[in-house]
């Protein structure tokens, strides 16, 4: 009968654990106390109660609070984060490191050199990618600031549009001024303020039942109408005309006589006066008056003939009168 051979525990390897040294010693001490023998030692440590997050975990240190708005929240964000080149390299590095630790723990020497070479290569790539992370971080901060500015501008533009809509509604309620087509000024000119007579008549017809005196009242010329009628009374019109004529006497006289006739008369008077002045200035000088004894008989005859001519009949005057 072959005797039972006891396994030598000295040749068993201890797998690599991520538990800290102090926590591991505490676990070993508690395990020895629980078995009751200080020499009862097991090379395989117990599984830790709490999961220790790896340094290569991409979601390590991510808080789900409202302050982490630009971090991984949804499944789509996690998938997009996993497709990044640096994350893929980190995952590949972790997988190769796990394979290397397993082969070392199981004393398998095959492919150890290739795994170590891959780890070195991946380490160099990750170091170069880490240098690019700073640029991506700065760009992310810039994008976040631009998004905040865009949100602020959107809110401001919405407030401005709401105020403009309220102002437009208030302006619609105000009465409109007549449009000035000739000038680009906002204020209306005096010519634009003229109202058509037909529009005034329509407005007056809306205010009163009659636009003129009814026939029953117009047939009574001697009746005194009260002042509260829509149409004016005859005595009121007469008083108004007399008052206007007493105020503007000169204007009425000029309108009756005509300004043209007065100007013609003034021009005729000026011409007559000018002719008199010219005749006086252009007349020859008067002859020297002789003495009483110097008169001849011829001059006496001419005077006597002139006196006789005054009493004679002149046929030219008769023809002119005809």
Curated annotation (Swiss-Prot):
Subcellular location: Nucleus
Keyword Metal-binding: no
Predominant cellular place of this UniProt entry's protein: nucleus
Record keyword Transmembrane helix present: no
A GO BP entry: regulation of transcription by RNA polymerase II
Assembly information from the UniProt record: Component of the Mediator complex.
PANTHER family, alphabetized: MEDIATOR OF RNA POLYMERASE II TRANSCRIPTION SUBUNIT 4
Name assigned to this protein: Mediator of RNA polymerase II transcription subunit 4
